[in-house]
Curated annotation (Swiss-Prot):
PANTHER family noted in UniProt: 30S/40S RIBOSOMAL PROTEIN S4, SMALL RIBOSOMAL SUBUNIT PROTEIN ES4
Pfam families the UniProt entry points to: Ribosomal_S4e, RS4NT, S4
Protein name: Small ribosomal subunit protein eS4
Taxonomic lineage: Archaea, Thermoproteota, Thermoprotei, Thermoproteales, Thermoproteaceae
Gene: rps4e
Signal sequence annotation: none
SUPFAM superfamilies: Alpha-L RNA-binding motif
One of the protein's GO biological processes: translation
GO molecular function: rRNA binding; structural constituent of ribosome
Keywords: Ribonucleoprotein, Ribosomal protein, RNA-binding, rRNA-binding
Amino acid sequence: MVHLRRSLAPYWWPIPRKAGGVWVVKPSPGPHSFAYSLPLAIVIRDVLRYAKTLREARYIVSRGYIKVDGVVRKDYRFPVGLMDVIEIVPTGEVYRVVPDQDRYYNLLPIPSSEASLKLLRVEGKTTVNGGRLQLHFHDGRNLITSPDMGAKIKTFDTILYDLENKTIKTHIPMKLGVVAVVTHGSNVGFSGKLYEIVWTLKRRQSVVGLKKGEEVRRTILDYIMAVGEESPVIKITP
């Protein structure tokens, strides 16, 4: 089924609930889950407003005018999510999907120099042939690394990934003192210094504390992403 009822769409989608018909585009299976992604058609029509209708949005996508993470996507239902880089080919505009305190996820304009850079959170590691380690990231991407590099990078760490050259540019460990941003939950979009980690048996449910000035927020480890040692390594805020 390629559509779903508007009333059942994630609450943060920027669509009218009682206007525009009963149905809305449903994201196709892809790198991000349904609850935390937007189909390209809605990005084009309702967020960027390059189209007035779904038909116009489908045409724009089908012409190959939209790149996601450096790859032309022609599926109007393709799901875009956290930290994805969206490029409008004819205009050269580049956007990053970032956590936002008002809109949950929002498109942030970024310089073209950052079009090939993406933050990826490590969700797990496995050993493959030859003793090398394969890293698994939040967007479904996998990367095989040398044993030495793989040993340094832990689950919940973040890497700055070069989409064009498919290489790791920076490794940001999940540790006290780093700058992190909340990616899910009621505190989504808040960023600050990680000053506390209360480890629990289920590591993903460990309680963490972030501080920015006098403001303090608490959430769980599974809901944050490290974005820099002293400051974010790429643009994630206006």
